[in-house]
Amino acid sequence: MDAGGAVQFGSLLRKARKQRGLSQVELGGDRYSGSYISHLESGRRLASPEVIEFLSRRLGVSPLEWGTSPAGDTRSAAHDDAVEDLLVAERAWSDRDWGSAIAHSKQAAESAAASGDSTRHWEALYVMAQARFAAAEYAAAAELAEQLAEHQTARRFSVARAQALSLASIANRASDRLGWAIAFGARAVEAASAAPPIILSEALMALVSAMSEAGHPPAESRPFLDRLSQLAPRLTSDHSRGMIAWTLGAAAFVAGDPEAGLKYQAEAAKLLDQRRDLRLWLRFHSTAASWRLGAGITDGVPELLQTAAFGLQMVGNSYDMVELRQAEAKLALINGDAERARSMIQAVLDDPVTGGPEMALGQSQLLLAQCYQALGEADQARRQFAVAAMQLEVEGRLRAAVDAWRCSAGQPILTESLTRT
């Protein structure tokens, strides 16, 4: 099918679709998007034999009525479409245009499927999953990454499987499904056992971060942290070593070793490259401040928060802003301004976005309870600790939930879990 044939086919396709009263979305079903059908009807895309066969069955039309047949090979054209859209998607990714990256990677995946290129299909879907994660569509990113881990390309290549599982772990952690985050992180480490250091380190970081956030004892994550430390010298990128230092620092704070945590934070600050990922670099400042505050350390915190606040207001998402506001409220609380801290965190919870059901509310609820406690409102504090405990249980932060339940019963809190790495 040449360009002229594509236009003729598209016209006949549109006519057949309208005769049956179907929309473009309905015609595509769960296999092709409405935009892809639109491109076929306008002649901007060449229909592969597989597409022609699918559409003819959906519409009850013989391919011969369209002047074509499922026979014939247009795989090359579909392959070219996949390459083109994937290049555009990757460019959109670099420009932080997540919507375009998602749209073009989806089109690339459809073209790759039509051409029978399973590897390119996996690659396009992986770009889509990354773009959804960057756009803070964490649940959607997690679901797609889980599917990619079972893709035929992932079954052929352990590196592809490890990358998909790592992304599934990270996305599940971001969407507060910590049990799943740990499970996928463990599978990623297993899949990456013989992979290059950069792939294995990503899997290890996903696993230990999920374990720490879920409240697992430091001894359980120690073997994985040791492997991560041994991998760091084998990485050629300063930025990648900075990511490891960031992870090791957070683990040190969890283990009750703030001195080591500060050392790793200083190392990460030197190695992380803001040109590589500005949002990630800003989040490091925000979470570094949070870990210090959790250990009762205020030295350097105002400067860290100032840097984070300036940049995250421009490039951060709502999840980033919640983390930042929690740290700012914690600093106010430690500095003795409990009323200001309460006002700040209440504003987070009252906001329809930052206090919405898709957000992790447990940490904010816990901080609000601590504010009431500092203000001497004991009864309100106990009730709020109970609210926080129930939410933390739902999110899988079991150690923090136990602490909150203890406080609701008037017992002292044992640990602090107000940060996310």
Which residues are covered by each model-predicted region?
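DNA major-groove recognition helix of helix-turn-helix/homeodomain DNA-binding modules
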Residues: 48-65, 412
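A short, Lys/Arg-rich alpha-helix, primarily the initiator
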Residues: 1-19
